[in-house]
Design a protein with these regions (language model features):
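DNA polymerase processivity clamps
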Residues: 1-8, 15-70, 85-200
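Glycine-rich, pocket-lining loop/helix-strand segments that form or immediately flank
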Residues: 73
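Short, flexible active-site loops
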Residues: 76-87
Length: 200
């Protein structure tokens, strides 16, 4: 989490000696991701992780990574993931991604906002920039709830869409001022994402 977004991912583990909670530095996570995606042994997808009060050691067939842990207690993240949200948007992942990419043409380092206008059968996307340029797009969707408008950081939405593996995605809202819950469109998603809204 960075205060604007939060991700939760769960995976199956075997041979657990105990359950530990720790905070791993971002640099260590990035290095693990690089090794597992680039140099993974095709015959084994297993990784062994050991944790004590100060360090983490991760081992694959060919690599060992050791990292110091971040001291402190991680916030109670499960309270951030709400349930029974009244506004539910379902749409095709690739259509949504393409529309966001078209909107991103007008974005810059200083401005990356996009406004989503939610209706029963369509999602309208709008973006503007300081040069008074404006982009608009519309895609089909299924939406349950009162019509509403909410703004988000384009880059944050695209990053989440890129890692969701199902054909469709779900966005769930309470109000336009609270975080959006993004998941795959299945009954028991193993990964969940919260993105906070922004003014656009």
């Amino acid at each position: 989490t960075d205060g604007h977004r939060l991700a939760l991912s769960e995976t199956e583990a075997t041979d657990l000696n105990s359950i530990s909670t720790c905070i791993i530095p971002r640099k260590c996570i990035s290095e693990l991701k690089r090794i597992l995606t680039t140099y993974s042994d095709e015959n084994s997808n297993l990784i062994t992780i050991g944790v004590n009060s100060r360090n983490l050691v991760a081992k694959t067939n060919n690599y060992v990574i050791k990292s110091k842990l971040i001291e402190g207690k991680y916030p109670d993240y499960r309270k951030v993931f709400p349930e029974n949200l009244p506004h539910v948007l379902k749409l095709n992942k690739n259509n949504f991604k393409s529309a966001l990419q078209r909107m991103s043409i007008l974005s810059s380092e200083q401005y990356k906002g996009v406004k989503l206008s939610l209706n029963a059968t369509s999602l309208d996307l709008t973006t503007t920039n300081p040069q008074q340029e404006k982009g608009e797009d519309k895609i089909d969707c299924s939406y349950t709830g009162e019509p509403m408008e909410v703004g988000f950081n384009l880059a944050y939405l695209l990053e989440v869409i890129d890692v969701i593996e199902t054909d469709n995605v779900q966005l769930r809202f309470d109000t336009q001022d609270t975080g959006c819950l993004l998941t795959s469109d299945d009954n028991s998603p193993t990964s969940k994402y919260i993105i906070m809204p922004m003014r656009v």
